[in-house]
From Swiss-Prot:
Entry-linked InterPro entries: GTP-CH-I_C/QueF, NADPH_dep_7-cyano-7-deazaG_red, QueF, QueF_type1
Protein source organism: Syntrophus aciditrophicus (strain SB)
Positions contributing to substrate binding: 73-75, 92-93
HAMAP family referenced in this protein's UniProt entry, alphabetically: QueF_type1
One GO term of the biological process aspect: tRNA modification
Membership in a protein family: Belongs to the GTP cyclohydrolase I family. QueF type 1 subfamily.
UniProt name for this protein: NADPH-dependent 7-cyano-7-deazaguanine reductase
Coiled coil start-end: none
Length: 140
């Protein structure tokens, strides 16, 4: 087994190593261990969007976990993707599900879960969990 990342894995990446702006484009690279079920978790404590009613900022700890199939999510593209929501007026429940849908569309993972823990607003915190399981796949 090759121990370093082969150059062909880098050929599809257009954002990594370059100055960039917010983007809704999620990039991937090949999973070199498709025969194994393993969990990848990406987390940020800096996710922001805005309330569509008040325009006030909403802050969340965001966790994206998935079991890859053929592809792995490239982290800079995820950072720029999440940044694109900074000024987006969108409800917590909706944005969590949209992020799940976009990650699933980019990766076609075996399993994926997005958890968003939003900060307290009006004395109430909101946690949204959205989950996807590839048809026919069952967790071992």
């Amino acid at each position: 087994m090759q121990k370093s990342t082969p150059p062909e894995d880098l050929s599809r990446l257009t954002l990594l190593g370059r100055e960039a702006k917010p983007s809704r484009k999620l990039e991937t690279f090949p999973n070199r261990h498709p025969d194994r079920d393993y969990i990848v978790t990406m987390e940020t404590a800096e996710f922001t969007c805005v309330c569509p009613m008040t325009g006030q900022p909403d802050f969340a700890d965001l966790h994206i976990s998935y079991i890859p199939d053929a592809s792995i999510l490239e982290s800079k593209s995820l950072k720029l993707y999440l940044w694109s929501y900074r000024n987006e007026g969108i409800f917590h429940e909706h944005v969590t599900n949209v992020i799940l849908e976009d990650v699933v569309a980019a990766l076609s993972p075996r399993w994926c879960k997005v958890t968003a823990n939003f900060g307290v607003r009006g004395g109430i915190s909101i946690t949204v969990e959205a989950e996807y399981k590839k048809p026919g796949w069952s967790k071992p």
